[in-house]
Amino acid sequence: MLQAIGWPWPGPPADSAWQAMCAMYSQCRPARVIEQHRSGYVVAEAPEVPIKVESLPAWQRRSFPPHERAVVGDWVLLDGRRIVALLPRRTVIKRLAAGEHYRQQLIAANLDTAFIVCGLDGDFNPRRIERYCVLIASGGVEPVVVLTKVDLCVDVAAAVAVLREHSSQALAVVAVDARKAEPVVALYPWLLPGRTVALLGSSGAGKSTLTNTLLGEQRMKVGEVRQRDSRGRHTTTHRALLPLPSGACLIDTPGMRELKFTGEEDLVEEFADIELLATQCRFRDCAHQAEPGCAVRAAIGCGTLDPQRLHHYFKLRGEIVGAADRSMLRRY
C-alpha cells in the first residue's frame, strides 16, 4: 500500500542510503508525512488512513534547525506512533523564511513535479514564475506552469508565448479551466501512479479549485479574489498530501507571498542560454559588463539575447550570492 502514497519502488528501497537506514531500524516501518501542524505530524502507511504521531524529541527544541525537521512529503520510520528517523530526501523545495535572520523554510519533499499555478488575471507575472522555476529546479524537481482562469484572458496563446520567451529551458506550460474536469486531463502526464506533485502559487491563483477538480470532489475550501489586485485569502492554511484517483499524490500548499532564495540555488536550468554563452567568453572571470570578447554582450548586440533577461539574471544571481553570504555569517 506504500506505493499508493508515493513510495518510489515496487518493493524494498533500491536507494543505498535508504537501505542502510531501514537496516539500522529493522524493527520500524516506513510511513509518509501527509500533514504538518505546530502540534505535530500526521503520517500514513496507506491512503486515507492517517496516523497522528509523536516527532523526534530533538525536533521540538526551538534551537533545532527547521530545515532538518520533517516536512510534508518526507518519509519517516515509525516505532508504534513515534517517529524515530527521517529517511534521506530525494528532492526538496525550500525558500528563505521571512524576517531579518537567516532561516530556511522547507515547502515539500520527495516531489517529482511542482505545478506553478498562476491565474491569467492580475496574478500573471512572468518574472515571478521565473523565480519559482529557479527555486523548484534547484531542488531537483520538474517545474510545470499551470495557467488558470483562461476565461478571463483574451489571448491565452500570447500569454503562453510570453512565458516561453522568459525561459530558456523546455518549460511545460498548460492552460486550463481549473473548474472543469475535461481540460485538466492535460495535466495527467504528470499525475501517473506513484508520482508526487505539489501545487505552488499565490493566494487566489486557483490551487484549491484545481485540487478539488483533480480529486473529483469539493474537499478544499475555495475563497474569493479581490478584483483590485487579483489576490485571495489563504483558504489553504497548512500543507497536506492527498492521494488522487489517478494514483498520484498531490501536495496542496498555502499561497506564497515571498520567494526568497536560500543561497544554495543555481541558475543553470532556468538561464541555460546565458550560462552557455558565458562559457564562450574570452575571460573565464568575465562579468559580462564591458570586457572584450564577452559572448553574452555580443549576443545582446546581435539581438539573440534580450537585455531584460540578462538584467533579471544579474538580479537573481545577486540575491543568491547575498543569501549565501548571510548563511556563512550565521555559521560564525
Curated annotation (Swiss-Prot):
Binds 1 zinc ion per subunit. One of its GO terms (cellular component) is cytoplasm. It comes from Xylella fastidiosa (strain M23). One of its GO terms (molecular function) is GTPase activity. NCBIfam families: ribosome small subunit-dependent GTPase A. One of several proteins that assist in the late maturation steps of the functional core of the 30S ribosomal subunit. Helps release RbfA from mature subunits. May play a role in the assembly of ribosomal proteins into the subunit. Circularly permuted GTPase that catalyzes slow GTP hydrolysis, GTPase activity is stimulated by the 30S ribosomal subunit. This is Small ribosomal subunit biogenesis GTPase RsgA. Keywords: Cytoplasm, GTP-binding, Hydrolase, Metal-binding, Nucleotide-binding, Ribosome biogenesis, RNA-binding, rRNA-binding, Zinc. Monomer. Associates with 30S ribosomal subunit, binds 16S rRNA.
